[in-house]
């Protein structure tokens, strides 16, 4: 038997259902911020790490929030739009700063972003439908998305070039992102499912 809502509840539900595009814009903005910060680094001992490692977990968190509240289809739209805006931003900025645009420069990041987002989205949707919000499984979904992202980024952008300290910086990045993901997973597990799920 379908739920019956009062007039006020229906108005709130309509506003909530129409608000998904704001989160898609937020996702696009965070993706562009992560792209902008990828060239800025900080050093931990002899390791050079980029500031975007702190932004990337938030990207997956926002995508998972869209999935949980508004459904799989809205997340696919969000991933497509943010990926397209990432390429457009790189194109516009290359002309603004007077450099030639090279798709090669953004291909690793773009492919890593899109593939890891769809892997994350597929696993997360499976967890939403078939489990009751497991903390460990949600955390592992985030971590697996990072592994896929760095795999494609390394494969396409760096041509599998592995420097002397590559693995140390790789695992350091995953550990730092994992610590941030513990907090985000705590919030993620406590978000209520939306109407589309």
What would you call each of these model-derived segments?
Residues 1-17:
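Short, Lys/Arg-rich, polar N-terminal cytosolic tail immediately upstream
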Residues 5-6, 57-59, 160:
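Short hydrophobic/aromatic segments of transmembrane alpha-helices and their interfaces
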Residues 106-197:
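Membrane-embedded alpha-helical hairpins and interfacial helices in multi-pass inner-membrane proteins
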């Amino acid at each position: 038997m379908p739920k019956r809502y009062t007039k006020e509840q229906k108005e709130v539900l309509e506003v909530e259902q129409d608000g998904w595009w704001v989160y898609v814009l937020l996702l696009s903005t965070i993706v562009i911020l992560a792209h902008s910060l990828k060239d800025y680094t900080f050093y931990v001992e002899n390791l050079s790490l980029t500031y975007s490692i702190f932004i990337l977990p938030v990207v997956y968190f926002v995508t998972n929030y869209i999935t949980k509240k508004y459904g799989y289809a809205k997340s696919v739209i969000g991933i497509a739009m943010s990926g397209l805006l990432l390429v457009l931003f790189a194109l516009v900025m290359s002309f603004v700063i007077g450099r030639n645009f090279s798709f090669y420069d953004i291909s690793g990041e773009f492919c890593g972003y899109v593939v890891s987002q769809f892997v994350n989205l597929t696993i997360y949707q499976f967890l939403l439908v078939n489990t009751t919000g497991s903390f460990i499984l949600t955390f592992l979904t985030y971590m697996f998305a990072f592994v896929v992202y760095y795999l494609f980024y390394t494969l396409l952008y760096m041509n599998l070039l592995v420097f002397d300290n590559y693995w140390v910086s790789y695992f350091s990045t995953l550990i730092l992102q994992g610590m941030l993901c513990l907090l985000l997973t705590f919030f993620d597990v406590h978000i209520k499912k939306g109407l589309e799920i």
